[in-house]
């Protein structure tokens, strides 16, 4: 994803989708708070997202799935009780060594229910952190362990990845059933493609999540054009 082909894909998914996002925002109460931030980001989002892929040797770096959302997880349930027994990640096509923010932000913004997406974000980060430390010890990791604050610093630093998730996996996961859903319609210039993109970013459920997520990203500084 962080090569030339990936750059073109990211641009299509983010910078090119700004007009659709802005049109949708005008229908959401309170959008004035963050509307200009997103408008000013247009043309700069791709480069900011690519910066997330730059490895910082001073931070903890992990092997990310890089497309971590519910559609790429298989679940195994007990046939009688329905109890969840196990889960497996699938589709390892774009794995990336780098910041923990890549998978954490993508998964937590795309695959959680509306009522816990923001309200329980820090809770889930703590659960991740506890499991991380447990397994670093299990694997006899011999470098300095990250603190929970270190993980949060990485999430704040790479907050623009949250906007990537909003345009990409969150939109896909909340898309209402339609026969027009296809990669061609996501990226081509036809009237049918334009209609699909309008549907993708203007769905009722998607807008309910936008109304919660975008102010949250705004308040975290994730939508700032310039880093102070």
Predicted features along the sequence, with ranges:
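Active-site activation/catalytic loop segments of kinase-like enzymes and analogous catalytic loops
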Residues: 94-138, 161-185, 191-195
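Acidic, serine/threonine- and proline-rich low-complexity regulatory regions
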Residues: 54-56, 111-116, 135-158
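Catalytic activation segment of kinase domains across protein kinase-like and atypical kinase folds
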Residues: 47, 55-62, 69-111
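Generic recognition of stable, solvent-exposed alpha-helical segments in well-folded globular domains
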Residues: 12, 16, 59, 63, ...
């Amino acid at each position: 994803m962080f090569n030339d082909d990936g750059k073109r894909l990211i641009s299509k998914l983010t910078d090119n989708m700004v007009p659709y996002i802005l049109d949708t925002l005008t229908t959401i109460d309170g959008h004035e708070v963050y509307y200009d931030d997103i408008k000013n980001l247009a043309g700069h989002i791709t480069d900011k997202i690519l910066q997330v892929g730059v490895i910082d040797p001073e931070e903890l770096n992990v092997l990310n799935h890089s497309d971590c959302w519910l559609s790429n997880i298989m679940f195994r349930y007990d046939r009688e009780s329905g109890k969840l027994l196990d889960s497996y990640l699938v589709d390892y096509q774009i794995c990336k060594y780098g910041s923990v923010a890549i998978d954490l932000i993508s998964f937590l913004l795309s695959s959680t229910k509306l009522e816990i997406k923001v309200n329980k974000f820090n809770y889930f980060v703590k659960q991740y952190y506890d499991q991380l430390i447990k397994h670093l010890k299990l694997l006899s990791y011999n470098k300095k362990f990250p603190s929970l604050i270190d993980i949060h610093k990485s999430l704040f630093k790479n907050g623009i990845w949250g906007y990537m998730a909003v345009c990409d996996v969150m939109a896909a996961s909340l898309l209402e059933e339609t026969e027009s859903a296809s990669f061609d319609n996501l990226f081509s210039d036809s009237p049918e493609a334009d209609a699909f993109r309008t549907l993708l970013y203007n769905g009722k459920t998607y807008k309910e999540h936008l109304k919660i997520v975008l102010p949250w990203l705004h308040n975290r500084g994730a939508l700032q054009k310039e880093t102070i």
